[in-house]
Amino acid sequence: MEAPLQTGMMGTSSHGLATNSSGAKVAERDGFQDVLAPGEGSAGRICGAQPVPFVPQVLGVMIGAGVAVVVTAVLILLVVRRLRVPKTPAPDGPRYRFRKRDKVLFYGRKIMRKVSQSTSSLVDTSVSATSRPRMRKKLKMLNIAKKILRIQKETPTLQRKEPPPAVLEADLTEGDLANSHLPSEVLYMLKNVRVLGHFEKPLFLELCRHMVFQRLGQGDYVFRPGQPDASIYVVQDGLLELCLPGPDGKECVVKEVVPGDSVNSLLSILDVITGHQHPQRTVSARAARDSTVLRLPVEAFSAVFTKYPESLVRVVQIIMVRLQRVTFLALHNYLGLTNELFSHEIQPLRLFPSPGLPTRTSPVRGSKRMVSTSATDEPRETPGRPPDPTGAPLPGPTGDPVKPTSLETPSAPLLSRCVSMPGDISGLQGGPRSDFDMAYERGRISVSLQEEASGGSLAAPARTPTQEPREQPAGACEYSYCEDESATGGCPFGPYQGRQTSSIFEAAKQELAKLMRIEDPSLLNSRVLLHHAKAGTIIARQGDQDVSLHFVLWGCLHVYQRMIDKAEDVCLFVAQPGELVGQLAVLTGEPLIFTLRAQRDCTFLRISKSDFYEIMRAQPSVVLSAAHTVAARMSPFVRQMDFAIDWTAVEAGRALYRQGDRSDCTYIVLNGRLRSVIQRGSGKKELVGEYGRGDLIGVVEALTRQPRATTVHAVRDTELAKLPEGTLGHIKRRYPQVVTRLIHLLSQKILGNLQQLQGPFPAGSGLGVPPHSELTNPASNLATVAILPVCAEVPMVAFTLELQHALQAIGPTLLLNSDIIRARLGASALDSIQEFRLSGWLAQQEDAHRIVLYQTDASLTPWTVRCLRQADCILIVGLGDQEPTLGQLEQMLENTAVRALKQLVLLHREEGAGPTRTVEWLNMRSWCSGHLHLRCPRRLFSRRSPAKLHELYEKVFSRRADRHSDFSRLARVLTGNTIALVLGGGGARGCSHIGVLKALEEAGVPVDLVGGTSIGSFIGALYAEERSASRTKQRAREWAKSMTSVLEPVLDLTYPVTSMFTGSAFNRSIHRVFQDKQIEDLWLPYFNVTTDITASAMRVHKDGSLWRYVRASMTLSGYLPPLCDPKDGHLLMDGGYINNLPADIARSMGAKTVIAIDVGSQDETDLSTYGDSLSGWWLLWKRLNPWADKVKVPDMAEIQSRLAYVSCVRQLEVVKSSSYCEYLRPPIDCFKTMDFGKFDQIYDVGYQYGKAVFGGWSRGNVIEKMLTDRRSTDLNESRRADVLAFPSSGFTDLAEIVSRIEPPTSYVSDGCADGEESDCLTEYEEDAGPDCSRDEGGSPEGASPSTASEMEEEKSILRQRRCLPQEPPGSATDA
């Protein structure tokens, strides 16, 4: 401010002086003119006797005084204003200085502007012939000056932008009470009833008519054991406590219910709806303080279902979905419980033997029997593999499908998961418009089936049997029936049929109709298949998507479930004759949670999922029977947990909890997305991570009872399972084995944090990188992606189809646009009145598919707004060969609070030039989490009509996507399956990197991310630019050849104050390779590592000048001077001093698998012991004396080198022991750091080593496992343990934290030794009677002798699960 002020003062004073002098000159000039004027001069002298007034002089003095006063006032005003301006404090960050080269550039540009102006004026001005030689000289001098002062235009740098407030901050308003005109009780009831699905306005108003207010004083009970369990209780104000009683009369609080939450058990609601209501057994609820409770009787639902029967199927389905996705998810997947969740002894129907029927027979149906074709067997979709679009049958889990026999010529349509063109909206017009249609979608039934069932024009081919049987599988046998039963063994079915067999089957069909309460038995016609499986056959495998109902006729089916963290299966229960199995998965549409295995020969009826839904469409009450059989199998412990575990919803922008809140529960994400943000002491907010479907949130704080460390808010509407702290304590007391599982979960979190915090540098320095991509990579575990075009020229339809084709190779993918939505849900689907129905349908699609793509419209339509609201991530798609622009839709997007992360995707033609000007694309946008360059096939840019485009991509979808294409790379990035390549430093030994790269390409392993240190950063940058090992080898060989030159290093020598060389020659060699390429313009995402000796920290470079940061990462101390960072002037050295193999950084950037190649030198560890002191003369003698024993003692240079690489060595050990890293080290120890002249030899060593390693990978299916979706694999598979042991995180500490239980005042007795899974009868067993002595096989005489041992084993398993009741039946702790 001072310099401009002085300049202004000088300018003002000089201007006044010029004015005064100018005025004086004018006066003199006037006087001179007066004197010389012929007429005026004489007239003046004649009249000189009369005096003339002195008015002009007085006027001048007055004007001068006025000017002086004005100037003085202005000066005083400026001084006062200057003194009043507060001095802003200097920022705490680094002070940027104006460097000398920047000054040179500034003045050089100034001179060039002057030169250009002079040149233009000289060229435009016409000159005479005499001045032409002079002008030529001037032009020549100007050209020389131009050459001397020629300054290239500086490339733009990426502007650092902070995330907008909408990304890091949650909404301040909590709840909708303040902004809604509805009463609080209506809002609370709407929130809790919404758990049962969306009810239309008439239905909801009908329910509200049955609401009852109930006021409670402190200590009053809402309900107690023995009272009816037939209501939903919603807390309007106050606080309720959910308790379980103990044998000593004391109660354990398992859950606190705050205003807005409810107390209910969906299984109890199901009992009331199905007509099997029972009183409370153990659960009670009391008021912790004066409270007001809303009570909604479950009978209100029955009245609603009477008026709207289609809603019955939908509500029961939602209850089943909650049971599987909430209760089982929390208790099995995270707490490791298995057979504790099921009741092992219920009384099924007694079918065989039956009075008056021969024991050797089993019911069959109809008079004709023939072997079914592949059309009758539903192809089961294998996880991680798209279904075969040709409709060919897929092999079973063990390659042995079960042999079905069609009992009649079926006419039901074929069920299959369709891989169809998303743009093909034909056949979708009859989409869901009712609650049953929503249930149909929820059950994941093919749309074509629904169309045919409802009389649509599209009909799937009917299952037409043929006379040619399929190849006989090992798990099934040909049915042979003869009159001598000993000849058939355990296979009672054969080609002979009789009237007696037909009558038996009719009886079995009646039993099935009775069990399912089917009023019209003809509904089973053409929908039932008879199967016989040999001993050991797997009927269905855990995780299967397309499942069926199995009704056991003869024998039994064993139900197994894989244990958590163990490669073992545990038997849950045994399905006896007369039982249904598979109802839960059929009703929910979720994958099967157990494996069905025929431990011995078994015969059963099978109803496919599509046939069962058609039966339900004809008679909706059938769903009640199926649901009741599921509830009958649940253990009383599950019923208790159904009360305690909540299913909650958080709206977009709302905070789940805030930093510093009390930790009283753990959350599991069911669908949606959450973001975790931490607020530092300075008030700055930082993004910690994002959480998607299946992630566990808040477990560390809840188990350690620490306040919440971060604020977690919803990026979009999110559903969660809530596990209260008291419930967790109750489970730990009852099943102590849960403590081991909790220790495993907690140790993973704590060890990850300790690995970040206990490095040689503080966490804030950037040295400690969290090992889990879920914590640091926001674009991981995505479920929904919105695609937004920059301009109308972007081929959106072709782009989305290409991306969907690539994603299909990873998992089921759905593409939605406004046309598809209107075709499937009707023209009014996007109206505001259909808000909840559309949200529910979209949530179902998210559950049914690995990822959902939302294609926005070209303008800001309601569908575009919906896409942005549903998205976990927004892809902004532009054309890389066009001028950087900001689209109109993007400009509208900038004005809205969009919380989803944004990524820029630039499309390039296959034959076009490489990416350029990426920085300009990024700078003109607000904060983007990343960018990608895609080289697209020619068909993407071809101009075709929609019909031709559809025809083209039908052919494309018939082929599997190329894993090396850029769209496959984008698909892996979006699904969290990125494969990273990390190259270590080691001088000339790094030439072997290229050989390993060549072998990697030949093995077919794609690379999505490249990083490196030192020579690894150089090779990695070449590969990220070229994407070809051959071209990388060619350019690296030329550079290595230049490194063997002797003259350039000699000319680069300098006085060794900082380094031996000036670095100029080395800079030129690197610049010749990369020119002025920016990191942002590389084809592959790239990073390298340097050591910042100014801040004593590790620096990770992901943007900026490529050659400078490669040079900085290769800067050896003592040889080359540190490189000044162009951004902040910090001094950068070789990254190998701190992290020579940065696999952990690649992991933090979202890599699922990291291939790390180490070429560093290995230090000698077998050093000599010389005592407490060391004499240099003694060492000299030992070295000079040829007969003396050699001693291994490091010299001063080696000691300094080892000290410099201490952190690097420790980091390398961490990388080697990590489970995500594939560590490779070629045999290059015989080569030295500067052996660049042996390039080809070192390359061959790396190539041969890579061929051997990757050949083994191919034989061991390692590559296929890398490409398998991380969410389709068993997440509970045991992994390699981290060898790092931190003194503050031992097993004892974790056990003490996790095992901590409430004081004995809240002790709860387990009742029986095995909990409720005892001989204490449940309500269902009471109904069935006390007879437990039935025959398991139904016909002991008909069983083959080979199954006797299996029967004994089965009985021993059941005997192990039985226990004698230790207390009266009334004390059994069931719900």
Swiss-Prot record:
Enzyme type, top EC level: hydrolase
Motif (GXGXXG): 985-990
Keyword Endoplasmic reticulum appears in the UniProt entry: yes
Catalytic activity: a 1-acyl-sn-glycero-3-phosphocholine + H2O = sn-glycerol 3-phosphocholine + a fatty acid + H(+); 1-(9Z-octadecenoyl)-sn-glycero-3-phosphocholine + H2O = sn-glycerol 3-phosphocholine + (9Z)-octadecenoate + H(+); 1-hexadecanoylglycerol + H2O = glycerol + hexadecanoate + H(+); 2-hexadecanoylglycerol + H2O = glycerol + hexadecanoate + H(+)
Localization in the cell: Endoplasmic reticulum membrane
Residues that bind a nucleoside 3',5'-cyclic phosphate 1: 195-322
Residues binding a nucleoside 3',5'-cyclic phosphate 3: 629-749
Biased composition (Acidic residues): 1313-1329
Entry-annotated residues carrying Phosphoserine: S354, S362, S372, S420
Domain of life: Eukaryota
Functional summary from the UniProt entry: Phospholipase B that deacylates intracellular phosphatidylcholine (PtdCho), generating glycerophosphocholine (GroPtdCho). This deacylation occurs at both sn-2 and sn-1 positions of PtdCho. Catalyzes the hydrolysis of several naturally occurring membrane-associated lipids. Hydrolyzes lysophospholipids and monoacylglycerols, preferring the 1-acyl to the 2-acyl isomer. Does not catalyze hydrolysis of di- or triacylglycerols or fatty acid amides.
Family: Belongs to the NTE family.
Protein name as catalogued: Patatin-like phospholipase domain-containing protein 6
